[in-house]
From Swiss-Prot:
Keyword field: Oxidoreductase, tRNA processing
InterPro entries: Rhodanese-like_dom (IPR001763), Rhodanese-like_dom_sf (IPR036873), TrhO (IPR020936), TRHO_N (IPR040503)
BP terms from Gene Ontology: tRNA modification
Protein name, entry field: tRNA uridine(34) hydroxylase
Catalysis performed (reactions): uridine(34) in tRNA + AH2 + O2 = 5-hydroxyuridine(34) in tRNA + A + H2O
Alphabetical list of Pfam families matching this protein: Rhodanese, UPF0176_N
SMART domains listed in its UniProt record: RHOD (SM00450)
Annotated gene: trhO
Amino acid sequence: MSQYIVCALYKFVSLEDYTEIRQPLTQVMEDNQIRGTLLLASEGINGTVAGSRKAIDTLLTWFKEDSRLADVVYKESINDVQPFNRTKVKLKKEIVTMGVEGIDPLHVVGTYVKPADWNALISDPDVLLVDTRNDYEVDIGTFKYAVNPKTETFRDFPQYVAENLDPAKHKKVAMFCTGGIRCEKSTAYMKEQGFDEVYHLEGGILKYLEEVPEENSLWEGDCYVFDGRVAVNHQLEKSHYDVCNACRLPITDEDKQSDSFEKGVSCPKCIDQHTEEQKSRFREREKQVQLANERGETHVGGDAAKLIEQRKQEKKEKKQQQRSSK
């Protein structure tokens, strides 16, 4: 059985010519049948891709040919199936979107903590441990002692800090995320806001799960990942979660037994969030997916993704209205 190397990577580095990198990077991915998405911006590179061992090694060698990307941070895991449908290299304003101007992890950032030293830090009662990930990620797994900010997107994090954290009260703050990149931005932001002792887990949750034995671990549950595996367990293997193709949120076997679940159309988390017209489109898309599967092909559709972005924008506008009415 063929195995795929899933490679999550990022690096904050000045890439003024990032638009010119897109074409050759796309070419090396396509030539080596690597799928996934990489983001390029003037502040660096970020993304997750998957391919054969030889293909991923070729990509990493390609990065080494550019001195700016030679030491790109990456973490690998293995999967039995290709977790991505497409090959994409996108140009962005930020490689991880916080929406705050002037936050530069190359200028200031929190203190990195190795996975081997993480347990001791977060067990300190004087340390406030904050999970910087989104609410749906935290729901399926997090560290013992961690606070859930209940953010819907990373853009909500600055508001959480403004409303809940105080440099005079919270002297020591530790943060973590999936692979480390969000903490680069969040710790930089915290330092800019006057927080002195700010720490973050080097390599993120994935590196911790890789290096810390499960019997010594303070991780509880599974770790959400942004690919077809949905979530991984402590052994970095695909766990029991699937994804609802209507809202893209993780679902369990129990969710699939609910009367609110219709494959590709709705789940208990989104049953009331889509119109009947939207659900009809989802049913048609699911039909096309099944037909493609019968032909041994992969169906790629965009309706669900568009609706998710629309829903995020609606929630953002609702929050802004609530804040302005206070």
